[in-house]
């Protein structure tokens, strides 16, 4: 049983002991005990091996990150439809392989798809939902430890109305993770933004912020992002619509490269079919103030964790807005 409040305080205080903390196995998603440091070292080694197999010109890497259900796959598909190689959480795929004790031979599929194509490749990574390890793992740190040059990376931190994200977490995963743990994991995954941003700051990686935007404002929001990251000439509004397909594992995102997940993590219909970016039912909860959901967390003994997370995330947002 994790002390979630202690984990949150360690994140908030940038406690280096967090990486050495014992993470017990659950027998389903995580087969063996481990630490974040051990996972990071192992995944970085796997990445170095994969990148070495595709040695050559290093592309600019646009690195999308957010908590699960932030709208990252839909945004990734915009890049894919715009002609970029766009890979669905390749680093998390390696992490899950390590958690699930896959052998090296089981990495064959990710090896076949993990080629970063010059001059520009886009990947998306997320935090959560099944294990504390997934919530607190830092994929950007693993990438940098693999030897990928930070000068070729740009980070895009994604956000979405938290009440909508929580509703989506509950809708997709409440049958696979206990309600209390799922709510705690949700808050830890959001707090992990501090660790991601810190890794970028320490490596002098530029950071861009993007809010998943439904409806009529979606086109201008994505257009502004393309301009900010230096891709204004590649933006075409028509790429945000006309999506087809309803694959059980890939949804409507047929242009994205999807490495196959370890069996324990596969979930049919995780990706709802969308006709285009911002056109789905992105808003599942009409309450715009996430604090109105406090009682849900209190009922699961997570009141202190909720307060810590809301205060920390609000302070971070206010500081960025002031800057």
Question: Language model features by range: what are they?
Answer:
Residues 1-126, 237-307:
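PAPS-dependent sulfotransferase catalytic core
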Residues 94-97, 214-219, 243:
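A short acidic, often aromatic-flanked loop/helix-cap motif at beta-alpha or helix-coil junctions
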Residues 12, 197, 271-274, 294, ...:
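Residue-level detector of alpha-helical secondary structure
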Residues 71-82, 208-235, 252-267:
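PAPS/PAP-binding and catalytic site of the sulfotransferase fold
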Residues 127, 132-236:
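PAPS-dependent sulfotransferase catalytic domain
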Residues 72, 103, 159, 189-193, ...:
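A structural signal for well-ordered alpha-helical scaffolds and beta->alpha junctions
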Residues 101-104, 224, 250:
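Short low-complexity, flexible loop/linker segments enriched in glycine and/or proline
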């Amino acid at each position: 049983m994790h002390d979630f409040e202690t984990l949150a305080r360690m994140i908030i205080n940038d406690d280096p002991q967090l990486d050495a903390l014992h993470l017990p196995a659950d027998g389903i998603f995580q087969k063996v005990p481990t630490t974040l440091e051990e996972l990071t070292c192992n995944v970085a080694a796997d990445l170095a091996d994969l990148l070495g197999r595709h040695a050559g010109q290093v592309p600019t890497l646009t690195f999308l990150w957010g908590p699960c259900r932030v709208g990252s796959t839909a945004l990734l598909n915009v890049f894919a439809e715009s002609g970029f190689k766009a890979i669905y959480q390749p680093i998390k795929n390696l992490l899950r392989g390590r958690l699930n004790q896959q052998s090296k031979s089981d990495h064959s599929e990710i090896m076949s798809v993990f080629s970063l194509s010059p001059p520009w490749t886009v990947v998306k990574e997320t935090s959560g939902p099944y294990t504390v390890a997934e919530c607190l793992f830092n994929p950007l740190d693993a990438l940098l430890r693999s030897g990928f040059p930070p000068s070729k990376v740009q980070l895009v931190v994604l956000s979405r109305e938290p009440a909508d994200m929580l509703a989506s977490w509950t809708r997709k995963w409440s049958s696979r993770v206990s309600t209390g743990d799922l709510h705690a994991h949700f808050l830890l995954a959001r707090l992990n933004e501090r660790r991601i941003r810190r890794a970028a700051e320490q490596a002098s990686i530029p950071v861009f912020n993007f809010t998943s935007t439904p409806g009529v404002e979606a086109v201008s929001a994505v257009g502004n992002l393309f301009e900010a990251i230096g891709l204004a000439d590649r933006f075409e509004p028509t790429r945000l619509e006309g999506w087809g397909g309803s694959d059980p594992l890939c949804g409507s995102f047929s242009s994205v490269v999807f490495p196959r997940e370890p069996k324990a993590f596969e979930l049919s219909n995780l990706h709802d079919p969308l006709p285009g970016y911002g056109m789905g039912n992105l808003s599942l909860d009409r309450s715009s103030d996430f604090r109105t959901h406090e009682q849900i967390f209190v009922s699961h003994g997570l009141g202190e964790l909720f307060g810590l997370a809301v205060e920390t995330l609000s302070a971070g947002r206010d500081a960025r807005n002031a800057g």
